[in-house]
Amino acid sequence: MRPLNSTLQFIAIFKLYAVRIFSFVTLFLLLNTIHAQGQIDTANVQAPISKFEIGVAGGLTVNKFSSGQPQTGTNTGYDAGLLLTYNVYKQWSIQLEASFTQQGGQLLTFKDDTRYGLPESFTTKNVKNSSVHLNSLNIPLLLRYTIPIKKDWKPALYIGGSYAYNFNVIERYQKTGNLLPGEDIITTVTDSENVTSRYNRDRLNLIVGADLRLPLFSNVKLLLDFRYMAGATPAYENYSYMEKIGFGSEIKSNSFIAKLGLIIPVQ
């Protein structure tokens, strides 16, 4: 009977340990499954998008007056300012900016007052090549659509408009004419002039553009911004490249602007 008792005892012990091992393995597998599911859920849950983003940006402007007058050309300027983006719904957002912006362009003017009976001189008959900078406070309001390509790679397209206040207009020019009529002594004078009173103080612009926001470090993003700003209202009224009364037209300032900036989310 002892061998039978030993066998039964061994079987009982084996069953006991088998049940314990099975229970342990089952518990381990269950906990491992729960842990893995938790990791998947965490990976699937994206960090909440900040409603507001603030930033600074600056860059260069390439400017040209509208072709209402044939004698126009381009010049360059600067743009620098602040921006605030409000994420409205999914990929849609509104952006408000305040910036110092240089617009303008080049103008070529032919002056000949001898047609009015004045004697010929350097003052009454000359050719002036001017580069005009409209130094303005610019307030753009933009509607943005972010293209959902990648989580950390966010290009966007936008349209909008801006109000610009010209607080200062500077004209730098080269004026060429006959210094001594009859002697053919041609000279060129270089100078600058404040011509704020000749230009409209208030202007409106239409804007279309695109930007790209890339992760830089921590929560800071790098901003690349490219836009075209077209004048909706004139910068100069009744401008004539011949300085002839009654033959003038309105000219507007159009600009291509490229900027770099930094964006920080605000919770």
Where do the protein language model's features map onto the residues?
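Predominantly the C-terminal beta-signal and adjacent terminal strand-loop region
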Residues: 203, 211-267
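Long, hydrophobic/aromatic N-terminal blocks
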Residues: 72-88, 92, 97, 187-190
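Flexible, solvent-exposed coil segments and beta strand-coil junctions
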Residues: 59-65, 115-125, 182-193, 236-242
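Extracellular loop and loop/strand-boundary signature of outer-membrane beta-barrel proteins
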Residues: 66-70, 124-130, 193-198, 243-250
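Short glycine/proline- and aromatic-enriched beta-strand/turn motifs that initiate or cap beta-hairpins
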Residues: 36-83, 263-267
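Gram-negative (and chloroplast) outer-membrane scaffold detector with strong preference
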Residues: 42-52, 86-180, 216-218, 259-267
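Cleavable N-terminal export/targeting peptides
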Residues: 1-48, 265-267
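Residues that define the transmembrane beta-barrel architecture of outer-membrane proteins
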Residues: 50-52, 74-78, 133-137, 153, ...
